[in-house]
């Protein structure tokens, strides 16, 4: 069980294949979802959303000390290794100002989701403090239930409802607050029809019928928005200018490389001082996030060393 997963960040805890025997001890309900691959190796039935949820429960308990985790049916069940990669690469970005990863960084997660995945990983790995924003009251309730069910998380993670339709930072970042970074996994598709087509494609690839519920399901606000991710991130870029002195790094995942040029143009238009692209790879899946700041090197050094 020592095969490497190519491309993961060096500090990612998921380089080796899953130790399913250990994970089944951590969460016994995972055992019923184990299958054999054509090569005769044990694996998890990734087409079954209950299996993926059981795997996530085991991973979060075993690696991140999250003993109690659950999400309502129909919400995204995120792949933990890929989410951890974003956190580790973000840590490297925050370290460039002072040479060390800040231990008390304050992070804003835009669209924290029912799963609360980024704060859970970031709190455990780096001791960061998180604010999570969310438009869905059901997702917010789920995330709060996870926080309340695990000792210590209430002190590290706070949640805020985004009540203003179409707003991202406005109404969430308060007047005197400062954040070392923001992160976001934006809605990917540009319509409900496109989101359904994407799910259909994945169903076919897994050889399932259309009635099967899947771990790549998700609520409307998780999967699509008008104009897709380019429009969403452009809106984020536009709003970020108003918080240029309160946030050191704004970041967002970008699912498709071809979406980068219009985003770079938007960043030039708002006067971003520095723009960084971080490439990531999880197995065959390529992804990346972009980061931008309105602070120069000296301003970022002072920001990191500010009184907290």
Swiss-Prot record:
GO molecular function, one term: 23S rRNA (adenine(1618)-N(6))-methyltransferase activity
Enzyme class: transferase
Any GO BP: rRNA base methylation
GO CC terms, sorted: cytoplasm
Record Gene3D superfamilies: Vaccinia Virus protein VP39
EC number in record: 2.1.1.181
Database matches in Pfam families: Methyltransf_10
InterPro entries per record: METTL16/RlmF, rRNA_lsu_MeTfrase_F, SAM-dependent_MTases_sf
Keywords: Cytoplasm, Methyltransferase, rRNA processing, S-adenosyl-L-methionine, Transferase
Catalytic activity: adenosine(1618) in 23S rRNA + S-adenosyl-L-methionine = N(6)-methyladenosine(1618) in 23S rRNA + S-adenosyl-L-homocysteine + H(+)
Subcellular location: Cytoplasm
Known role: Specifically methylates the adenine in position 1618 of 23S rRNA.
PANTHER family: RNA N6-ADENOSINE-METHYLTRANSFERASE METTL16, SAM-DEPENDENT METHYLTRANSFERASE
Family that this chain belongs to: Belongs to the methyltransferase superfamily. METTL16/RlmF family.
Name of this chain's protein: Ribosomal RNA large subunit methyltransferase F
Organism of provenance: Escherichia fergusonii (strain ATCC 35469 / DSM 13698 / CCUG 18766 / IAM 14443 / JCM 21226 / LMG 7866 / NBRC 102419 / NCTC 12128 / CDC 0568-73)
Lineage: Bacteria, Pseudomonadati, Pseudomonadota, Gammaproteobacteria, Enterobacterales
Record gene name: rlmF
